[in-house]
């Protein structure tokens, strides 16, 4: 993997450029795609692909992280006229974990209005969808999922496909609206994150992946924190969760959100815990509520809320091998046992939904009782919580709040499908968002692989988003190379699931790369791959010269034993044989008929007398 990485990763991919697809419905909607150019003379058209990297790979845009990214969704909000600016909650020292620190961290200087819904109005994408309104965000994600393909290029989705929620041949804004109205998909997009490029999470769309980042114990600059996010989205992360703890949380998050073109998620409980010096028993609803509003005003797009962990479920974990492995779950379990009462997240869930509704924040209902070992998979505690998450989903939907459900964890292959079936049944088809799952526990250092196996399977079965796992899982904090490895590993899993689901256009990139491989177009092979730099570097290790990029063999087989070169020879031989046989057949026909021109007049019809 790449070792020397610039502070902000802004360069475009090889043979690629950013293009923008204009919406036919909204004049102010232009959807970014990545166009990969292929070798001249190959008779191959350039390929447009889904792109998560934002403006950072656009050569025409100057990146200045002190100013943040363009606020692309502000015109859409202005036209809808159902939001209003208001005085923001003042930043407190404890927001940054600075109770005893006299030196504040650098704050993001560029200020903008803080927005909220007018007069308690529901301004969520679910509310619009249920009202039959197609928003700019819905049109945006439809174009994005199609990779620029338009309705005229493919048949329209059949109405019955929209009704039963299956995958259409082409995505339309109406299909997107229907999926959101049914709760099968969400567009996580806080109105206070106008820099975000809308994306959709749902099982009838591309499988998405999330990358987790967090502040280091020693941070050199805010640029370093922003670059963690930029690095993750460069390699394909569809969303990023900021799991920072300790000091500077508020300011770090502000820098990340202002510079992020993808949705940002958090676990608000982590910051709330910092405000009580890490003592779980001292947490209160008021502190947690204040933290939600703080993050909502900054623009966090989705909250992980561990509201499904209830007091009666805690004893169900006693006989587990690994107990409660969720950090948020263990915090709330400790609080519940100390106070011997239901979680304040469960008891105040209605109010949490009111806050989410005000800013269009999606709720990711956390699996605090997920299994942390394959021995604990699919147990009573896990499914008791899942049932509760289904009940909470209906509470959120009643307030037009978008919801997805978090899932395991550690699950052996033969138990994965049951997880998906239970989730669809108990949680009413809300999108599923899983961590892997890891399919075995014997491979520390390789858990990106053990989990990608489960991720590909559960993505095929219907999971909408996969949370990546890096090689450092269970061992330590991932560095940038680990993040890249984790993201690409999960892009492979997600793409494999898309192929198995029969997603429109999913196989086009595979086919283009396969043709390039068969034609020995080495640079096209590199440029079409998920990681062009590594593919090219591996080829350079044994065939480093520029002339080697033109040869019709690789170092694995050599010139005499290359199967594809032999296949070319076989194909040429067969074509010559067919051509020769055709000429012989024509000659025989000529000799038989004695004429160069063969009579092709239709035979006379027989007349039948009745």
From Swiss-Prot:
Gene Ontology MF annotations: 4 iron, 4 sulfur cluster binding; carbon-carbon lyase activity; zinc ion binding
Positions bound to Zn(2+): 410, 474
UniProt: substrate binding residues: 212, 241, 270, 306, 326-328, 367-370, 406, 433
Catalytic reaction list: 5-amino-1-(5-phospho-beta-D-ribosyl)imidazole + S-adenosyl-L-methionine = 4-amino-2-methyl-5-(phosphooxymethyl)pyrimidine + CO + 5'-deoxyadenosine + formate + L-methionine + 3 H(+)
Coiled-coil segments on the chain, per record: none
Cofactor note: Binds 1 [4Fe-4S] cluster per subunit. The cluster is coordinated with 3 cysteines and an exchangeable S-adenosyl-L-methionine.
Positions annotated to bind [4Fe-4S] cluster: 554, 557, 562
Gene3D superfamilies associated with the record: 6.10.250.620, Radical SAM ThiC family, central domain (3.20.20.540)
Secretion signal span: none
Subunit structure of this chain's protein: Homodimer.
Entry function: Catalyzes the synthesis of the hydroxymethylpyrimidine phosphate (HMP-P) moiety of thiamine from aminoimidazole ribotide (AIR) in a radical S-adenosyl-L-methionine (SAM)-dependent reaction.
Database matches in HAMAP family: ThiC
Family membership: Belongs to the ThiC family.
Name of the protein in its database record: Phosphomethylpyrimidine synthase
Gene giving rise to this polypeptide: thiC
């Amino acid at each position: 993997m790449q070792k020397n990485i610039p502070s902000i990763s802004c360069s475009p991919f090889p043979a690629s450029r950013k293009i923008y697809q204009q919406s036919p419905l909204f004049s102010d909607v232009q959807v970014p795609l990545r166009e990969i150019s292929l070798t001249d003379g190959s008779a191959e058209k350039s390929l447009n692909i889904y792109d998560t990297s934002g403006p950072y790979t656009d050569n025409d845009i100057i990146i200045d992280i002190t100013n943040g990214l363009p606020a692309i969704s502000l015109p859409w909000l202005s036209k809808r006229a159902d939001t209003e600016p208001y005085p923001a909650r003042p930043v407190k020292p404890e927001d940054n974990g600075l109770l005893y620190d006299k030196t504040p961290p650098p704050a993001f200087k560029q200020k903008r209005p803080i927005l909220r819904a007018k007069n308690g109005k529901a301004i969520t994408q679910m509310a619009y969808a249920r009202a039959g309104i197609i928003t700019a965000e819905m049109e945006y994600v439809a174009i994005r999922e199609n990779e620029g393909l338009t309705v005229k290029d493919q048949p329209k989705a059949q109405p019955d496909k929209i009704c039963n929620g299956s995958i259409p041949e082409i995505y339309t804004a109406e299909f997107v609206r229907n999926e959101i109205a049914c709760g099968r998909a969400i567009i996580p997009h806080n109105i206070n994150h106008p820099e975000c490029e809308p994306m959709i999470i749902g099982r009838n769309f591309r499988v998405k992946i999330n990358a987790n980042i967090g502040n280091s114990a020693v941070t050199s600059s805010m640029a370093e924190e922003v670059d963690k996010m930029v690095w993750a989205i460069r390699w394909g992360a569809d969303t990023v969760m900021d799991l920072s703890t300790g000091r500077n949380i508020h300011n770090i998050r502000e820098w990340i959100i202002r510079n992020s073109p993808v949705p940002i998620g958090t676990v608000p409980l982590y910051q709330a815990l910092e405000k009580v010096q890490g003592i779980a028993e001292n947490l209160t609803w008021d502190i947690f509520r204040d933290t939600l509003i703080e993050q909502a005003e900054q623009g966090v797009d989705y909250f992980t809320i561990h509201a499904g962990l209830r007091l009666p479920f805690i004893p169900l974990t006693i006989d587990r091998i690994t107990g409660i492995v969720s950090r948020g779950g263990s915090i709330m379990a400790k609080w519940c046992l100390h106070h011997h009462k239901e979680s304040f997240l469960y008891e105040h869930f209605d109010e949490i939904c009111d806050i989410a509704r005000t800013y269009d924040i999606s709720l990711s209902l956390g699996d605090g009782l997920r299994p942390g070992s394959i021995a604990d998979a699919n147990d009573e505690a896990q499914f008791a919580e899942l049932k509760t998450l289904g009940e909470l989903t209906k509470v959120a939907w009643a307030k037009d709040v978008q919801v997805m459900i978090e899932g395991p964890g550690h699950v052996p292959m033969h138990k994965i499908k049951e997880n998906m079936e239970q989730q669809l049944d108990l949680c009413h088809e809300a999108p599923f968002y899983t961590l892997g799952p890891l399919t075995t526990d014997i491979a520390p250092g390789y858990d990106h692989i053990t989990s990608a196996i489960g991720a590909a399977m559960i993505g095929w079965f219907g999971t909408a988003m996969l949370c990546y796992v890096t090689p450092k899982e269970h061992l330590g904090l991932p560095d940038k190379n680990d993040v890249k490895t984790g993201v690409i590993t999960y892009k492979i899993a997600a793409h494999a699931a898309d192929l198995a689901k029969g997603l429109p256009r999913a196989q086009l990139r595979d086919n283009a790369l396969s043709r390039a491989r068969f034609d020995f177009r080495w640079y096209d092979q590199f440029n079409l791959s998920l990681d062009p730099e590594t593919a090219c570097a591996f080829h350079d290790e044994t065939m480093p010269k520029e002339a080697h990029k033109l040869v019709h063999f690789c170092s694995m087989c050599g010139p005499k034993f290359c199967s594809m070169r032999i296949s070319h020879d076989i194909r040429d031989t067969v074509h010559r044989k067919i051509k020769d046989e055709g000429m012989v057949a024509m000659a025989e026909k000529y000799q038989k008929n004695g004429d160069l021109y063969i009579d092709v007049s239709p035979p006379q019809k027989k007349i039948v007398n009745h």
